[in-house]
């Protein structure tokens, strides 16, 4: 076969558009809803259509694409879809700022970002694309909501929530940072509003147990974070009888995991919203004002843990269940109404928050646990020590319970109090039910109707979807749906009377909790997912995304999979068999600081750098004025630090393949990647060298393909061995280890070996050809445009190519390198047959001229370490 000639220089901007057009024309990445044979579902977390891709996107989607292309080469049908997480606050805020409808803003962004993703060369089945803001998608979300509401898995209740007064919406606890809204930065308030909740707590035990099934496929860090978030604890509910029965007859029930410290209780603390607190405040204006102050703060657990401890005595008392001693009841801002019963038994001697509170308000502190292994450790009531909170040690100052250790004490208190109706053992979870109502416009409408006669009624299934009006330009003052009678005025499905449609929309985490399943059959009109498509493609074999989603998104998606399973929509218990959490992309930061401390950040593209001989930055100047800026070090690429690198600029200058290779080579995927212009140039040089190697080979015009293995020269044997070692390593690095950086390093070694090889006959040419076509095929997952273009010169269509098989015979070595030492010092090396005899090896070692000059005396000892060395002791 005659081999064609190619341009000697690599021109990425010429080849990439034509290759991408070829893929699109032939729909080479399209898969059916059901396929025969081996198949695999690879999914990277879908993007929010913010307007432009950032480097985090590029890294995420390149990782997914490398894995997808690898398995296609292995002969599997691969589903790799793409879509848009399109609802949410940012779109609404941007729409307010630009005075445009969120729908228009969103779909314009999608169009631009879709084009950017296609230019990355992703092997995506674009026929499966959808945006979550379309009625065709959220129809089925509403359908599931209705089913779950009817089953009691969704309920409505008045709830104290975090209210962001700027964004005019409820925030989840995780969206409150240091008492402020995560997006607006406004001080968060507390409000009581009616909200819909998913009973995720009904699934808490299963969500916890099933983490064990993910042990081999998920990072331990993520499993640990989820276990801690679900937070299963076994404790005791203890009732402290009321000492003021005329005011509050019921007493106080608390939940504790430290029942062993019961004899150290010196006060009881309740949340500001607790019924006892409200009762005590009825005739106490000062207490009522304090309760209102507490209500203005965040309800996020992390914030309460670190906030200044505030409290006020209610004037009410309860009785210690064992001793009958009267204990004061305090309102404390560190007690959560949403956890347990909203009341805690305070043991200042052995709980750090109680200790801090008791010292601030001069409350008694009573030690009831000794210091295990530290008999000489004195208990100080003024300075907290780590051992105070330990479960180790024995009870002291606890009367009949003295000397008991943790579990024995727990059992003893339960045995004493349970018959009196004052205690019972209880399992509790830290996980709270998921509040999904959002007082915003740009979200999925909640399919509920409020009727004065019938209460809350689900929208009939034949009236779904409840379609969100899209021609709305919000002005920032609350939810525009509340100003649209044409949306909210309706009839009650039960009584036919006038009713009001729910104007709250769903938390956008709901959309991203089931999108992975919809990709299996995105056009299906009969339900959330076509049953046979779900059976074929689910669960996702490999999921890829940032570790920042370890708790919320991944927990909610796991929850939704179980909900859909119980509705008969999907099979199996878990949505994602394997999870890869990629690290952040870091870049240099540069800034100037004003006298008032305000920092102005400059983009790296606008900075002129001076480096020392080791390449380290020693000075930086802003190109706009030539003046110096401060070098801030490498941080995560972000808008706030203005250190993002535009992927489009890299693609325009170097091509997508260079961006992909750099991203995969610069760091292991689960670690932070430090952006480096020199690294990008290095990746580009590597691809240019591959191109030149192929151009040079084609220039010679020799078409020999048949390898005569029995008559290979030593150099040809070495190149074949390198070729097949590389196949072995790249396969293992991609499939098992996800070590894409070392896979590329192995390809660089094969390139070097191929460049050094000089073919002397047709057999050599065939070996060189094998090395080059193998290099191109193994490189294809990383640099698909270049590989497809160059493989075509050898008559191979990349889209139909298969991953090379390892020839075991090529890996065997006929010769070996032996080190020769005299008195333990290296004096020479031998290249000998692998089956050489010991006597022959010693003879050749002694015959080496560079060895002979050191053999001046009689040889005392001859040491041979097989396959490694000869040591002659003289």
From Swiss-Prot:
The organism's place on the tree of life at top rank: Bacteria
EC number: 6.1.1.4
Record localization: Cytoplasm
Gene from which this protein is expressed: leuS
Disulfide bonds: none
UniProt-listed InterPro entries: aa-tRNA-synth_I_CS, aa-tRNA-synth_Ia, Leu-tRNA-ligase, Leu_tRNA-synth_edit, M/V/L/I-tRNA-synth_anticd-bd, Methionyl/Leucyl_tRNA_Synth, Rossmann-like_a/b/a_fold, tRNAsynth_Ia_anticodon-bd
Binding site residues for ATP: 639
Keywords: Aminoacyl-tRNA synthetase, ATP-binding, Cytoplasm, Ligase, Nucleotide-binding, Protein biosynthesis
GO BP term, example: leucyl-tRNA aminoacylation
GO cellular component: cytosol
Predominant cellular place of this UniProt entry's protein: cytoplasm
Enzyme class: ligase
Cross-referenced CDD domains: Anticodon_Ia_Leu_BEm (cd07958), LeuRS_core (cd00812)
Motif ('KMSKS' region): 636-640
Catalytic activity, reaction form: tRNA(Leu) + L-leucine + ATP = L-leucyl-tRNA(Leu) + AMP + diphosphate
GO molecular function: aminoacyl-tRNA deacylase activity; ATP binding; leucine-tRNA ligase activity
Name of this chain's protein: Leucine--tRNA ligase
Motif 'HIGH' region boundaries: 47-57
Pfam families: Anticodon_1 (PF08264), tRNA-synt_1 (PF00133), tRNA-synt_1_2 (PF13603), tRNA-synt_1g (PF09334)
Similarity section: Belongs to the class-I aminoacyl-tRNA synthetase family.
């Amino acid at each position: 076969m005659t081999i064609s000639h190619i341009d000697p220089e690599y021109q990425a901007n010429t080849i990439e558009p034509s290759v991408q057009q070829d893929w699109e024309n032939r729909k080479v990445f399209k898969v059916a809803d059901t396929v025969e044979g081996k198949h695999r579902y690879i999914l990277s977390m879908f993007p929010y259509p913010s307007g432009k891709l950032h480097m985090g996107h590029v890294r995420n989607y390149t990782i997914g694409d490398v894995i997808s292309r690898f398995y296609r080469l292995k002969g599997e049908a691969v589903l790799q879809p793409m879509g848009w997480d399109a609802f949410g606050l940012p779109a609404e805020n941007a729409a307010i700022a630009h005075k445009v409808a969120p729908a228009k803003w969103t779909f314009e962004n999608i169009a631009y970002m879709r084009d950017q993703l296609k230019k990355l060369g992703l092997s995506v089945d674009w026929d499966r694309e959808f945006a979550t803001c379309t009625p065709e998608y959220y129809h089925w979300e509403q359908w599931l909501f209705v089913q779950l509401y009817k089953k009691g898995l969704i309920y409505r209740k008045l709830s104290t929530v975090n209210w962001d007064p700027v964004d005019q919406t409820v925030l989840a606890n995780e969206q409150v940072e240091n008492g402020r809204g995560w997006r607006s930065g406004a001080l968060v308030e507390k409000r009581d509003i009616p909200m819909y909740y998913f009973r995720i707590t009904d699934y808490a035990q299963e969500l916890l147990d099933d983490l064990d099934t993910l042990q081999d496929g998920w990072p331990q860090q993520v499993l640990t974070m989820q276990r801690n978030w679900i937070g299963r604890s076994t404790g005791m509910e203890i009732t402290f009888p009321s000492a003021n029965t005329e005011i509050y007859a019921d007493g106080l029930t608390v939940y504790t995991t430290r029942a062993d410290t019961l004899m150290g209780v010196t006060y009881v603390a309740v949340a500001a919203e607790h019924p006892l607190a409200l009762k005590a405040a009825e005739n106490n204006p000062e207490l009522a004002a304090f309760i209102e102050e507490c209500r203005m703060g965040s309800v996020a657990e992390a914030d309460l843990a670190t906030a200044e401890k505030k409290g006020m005595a209610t004037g009410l008392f309860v009785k210690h269940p064992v001793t009958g001693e009267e204990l004061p009841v305090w309102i404390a801002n560190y007690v959560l109404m949403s956890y347990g019963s909203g009341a805690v038994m305070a043991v200042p001697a052995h709980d750090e928050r109680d200790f801090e509170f008791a010292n601030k308000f001069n409350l008694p502190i009573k030690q009831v646990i000794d210091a295990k292994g530290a008999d000489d450790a004195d208990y100080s009531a003024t300075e907290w020590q780590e051992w105070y909170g330990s479960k180790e040690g024995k009870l002291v100052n606890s009367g009949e319970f003295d000397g008991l250790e943790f579990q024995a004490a727990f059992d003893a208190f339960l045995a004493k109090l349970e018959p009196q109706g004052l205690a019972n053992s209880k399992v509790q979870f830290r996980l709270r039910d998921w509040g999904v109502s959002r007082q915003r416009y740009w979200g999925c409408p909640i399919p509920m109707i409020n009727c004065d006669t019938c209460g809350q009624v689900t929208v009939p299934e034949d009236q779904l979807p409840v379609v969100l009006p899209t021609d709305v330009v919000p002005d920032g003052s609350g939810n525009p749906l509340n100003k649209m009678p044409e949306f909210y005025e309706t009839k009650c499905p039960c009584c036919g009377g006038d009713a009001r449609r729910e104007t709250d929309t769903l938390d956008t985490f709901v959309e991203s909790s089931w999108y992975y399943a919809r990709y299996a059959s995105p056009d299906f009109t009969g339900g959330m997912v076509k049953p046979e498509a779900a059976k074929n493609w689910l669960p996702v074999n490999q999921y890829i995304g940032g570790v920042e989603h370890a708790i919320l998104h991944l927990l909610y998606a796991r929850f939704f999979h179980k909900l859909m399973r119980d509705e008969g929509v999907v099979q199996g218990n878990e949505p994602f068999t394997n999870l890869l959490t990629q690290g952040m992309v870091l870049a240099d930061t540069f800034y100037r600081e004003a006298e008032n401390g305000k920092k102005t950040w400059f983009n790296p593209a606008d900075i002129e750098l001076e480096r020392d001989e080791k390449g380290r930055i020693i000075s930086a100047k802003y190109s706009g004025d030539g003046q110096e800026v401060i070098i801030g070090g490498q941080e995560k690429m972000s808008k706030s630090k203005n250190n993002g690198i535009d992927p489009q600029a890299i693609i325009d200058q170097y091509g997508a393949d260079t961006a992909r290779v750099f991203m995969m080579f610069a760091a292991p995927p689960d670690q932070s990647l430090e952006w480096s212009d020199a690294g990008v140039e290095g990746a580009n040089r590597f691809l240019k060298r591959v191109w030149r190697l192929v151009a040079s080979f084609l220039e010679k015009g020799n078409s020999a393909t048949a390898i005569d293995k029995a008559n290979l020269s030593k150099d040809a044997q070495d190149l074949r061995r390198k070729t097949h070692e590389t196949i072995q390593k790249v396969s293992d690095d991609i499939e098992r280890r996800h070590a894409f950086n070392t896979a590329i390093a192995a390809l660089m070694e094969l390139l070097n070996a191929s460049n050094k090889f000089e073919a002397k006959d047709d057999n050599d040419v065939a070996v060189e050809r094998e090395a080059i076509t193998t290099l191109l095929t193994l490189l294809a997952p990383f640099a698909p445009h270049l590989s497809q273009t160059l493989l075509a010169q050898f008559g191979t269509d990349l889209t139909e190519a298969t991953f090379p098989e390892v020839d075991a015979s090529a890996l065997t070595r006929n010769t070996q390198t032996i080190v020769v030492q005299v008195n333990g010092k290296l004096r020479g090396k031998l290249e000998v047959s692998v089956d050489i005899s010991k006597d022959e090896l010693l003879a050749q070692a002694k015959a080496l001229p560079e060895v002979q000059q050191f053999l001046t005396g009689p040889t005392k000892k001859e040491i041979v370490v097989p396959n490694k060395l000869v040591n002659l002791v003289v």
